[in-house]
Structures are given as C-alpha cells and as structure tokens.
Amino acid sequence: MVLVSSKKLYYNPLNISFLPILTVSPMQIVFSPEKVARVLLWIVAFLTIANTLGQISHHFFGHSRLFGMVYLFNLNREWSVPSFYASFAVLFCSLLLTLIAWVHHRREEVDFKYWYGMAVIFLLLAIDEYTDIHNRIFEPVRSYLKAIGLISYAWLLVYVPLLLVIALIYRRFLARLPKPTIKLFVLAGVVYLVGAIGINLIGDQYTYQERDALSYSVFYTLEELCEMLGIIMFIYALLKYMEGYIGRLALVFLDREK
C-alpha cells in the first residue's frame, strides 16, 4: 500500500533497492477533497452532538459520568475521543504539507522550504492538541494577568505577536499561491482563529472562575467546533491544491509481480 498521485507515477520515494518490483491492481482509495471534507464534517458533527448530550446530562440531570462517556466525548478534555480526532486531523495536515513540500523539493522550486516549515508547525500543533501543553506552559502567565486584571487579554498578549511573526515570514509565499488557495487558506485561518483566540478570549473574560458552569461548556464547545471546522477547511484547501497542481492523492493497493 503506497501513496501516489492521480498521475499514476508509481515510484519508490525512499529509493530502497531491495523492494520487489510492483504492478498496479485496480484497487485504490482516492482522496477526493469533497469526500474527505464530508466525512470529517460528519465526524465533527457526531463529536459535537455527543459532547452536547454529555453536558446536558451533567448540568441538567446531575449525571456527570455515565460510565465515563461524558468525559470520553468531552471536547475540552485531554485523552478523549475529540482530542484524539483533533490531533489526527492536524497531523493529517502535517502529512499533506510534507507531501507537497517533497514534490516541490523534487521539482527544485524555492517555496518548498515554506511548505516544510508549515509541516513542522502543524506537527507541533498536533502534539499540543492531544497533550494540551500550551495551557500548562501559559498557566503562570494567565495567573499573573488575572492578578493584575488582564486575564481577558491573555491569549492576545501571547498569540497575536507569534501570529504576526509567522504572517510576516510567510507573506510573500502566500502571495505566490493560486488565488483559490489563498482564499481557502484565509477562510480556514479566520474560522480557526475565531475559536482559538476570539471565543477563547470571551470565555476567559466571563468564565475563568466558573469552569464547571454551563456557560463555560457553551464557550469551549463553540471554540473547539470553530477550530475543528477551520482544520477541515485547511485540509480541503490542501487537497484542492494538490489536485490542481500536483495530482490527486490516492492510496493504491499493489500486487507483487509474479
């Protein structure tokens, strides 16, 4: 089983000489941008509904466990089904970015470094999605800002400068991308940041001391939903870019030549 493009260029990207010669069978799974996005949207819908039902059970009926199901599908918990999905989705972005970078590198195009850079960024984001490292690192910052009355500005003070630096580094690269790709990238980024910074900012302002309140559940559900939708849009944008400028991605099942 190998990853190839729709141009049907079957090769050994690792250049390992002892691999047997392979012939192509008709079995393949094509990563259509529309179909991938549709599947991911159904998954996100299921996770959001499961989380919402769990919070209704907790806040309105006093059942906060339900055999561990409330925690298992909580969008705001580590080591839960939603955190596993979110980490996988971001990791998939990193994989797609790596494949795009590798192709551009093979073509000796200068922008491959930017694609590799994004792949590394999304790999780190995938690790953070599952482990929630950023909250542990920045908790002292949040505590200090709370003490001086600036808790509602915690995310702005930490993340906006970082985003500005990344935007400054990538501005020329983004300008060279096809216009449809730019639009999709911007839309995905806006939706993601509305959740990661916007809703998070509002949630910190109103619910910092009320982590068990219903309002906090509403805020983090909206936050995580925006982040997941933003990632789906980004995956769709990457697959559309690959489809138009590299080739449609597919998993092809190959038979050994007899």
What label would you give each PLM region?
Residues 28-43:
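N-terminal membrane topogenic signal
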Residues 43, 114-122, 179-204:
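Alpha-helical transmembrane segments of multi-pass integral membrane proteins
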Residues 45-64:
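Alpha-helical transmembrane segments of multi-pass membrane proteins
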Residues 63-79:
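Perimembrane loop-to-helix junctions flanking transmembrane segments
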Residues 79-90, 149-165, 222-228:
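Membrane-interface loop-to-helix entry segments
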Residues 95-99, 160-179:
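Alpha-helical transmembrane segments in multipass membrane proteins, preferentially the mid-helix core
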Residues 102-113, 172-183:
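Membrane-interface helix-boundary motifs at transmembrane edges
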Residues 126-167:
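Membrane-proximal helix-loop-helix units in multi-pass membrane proteins
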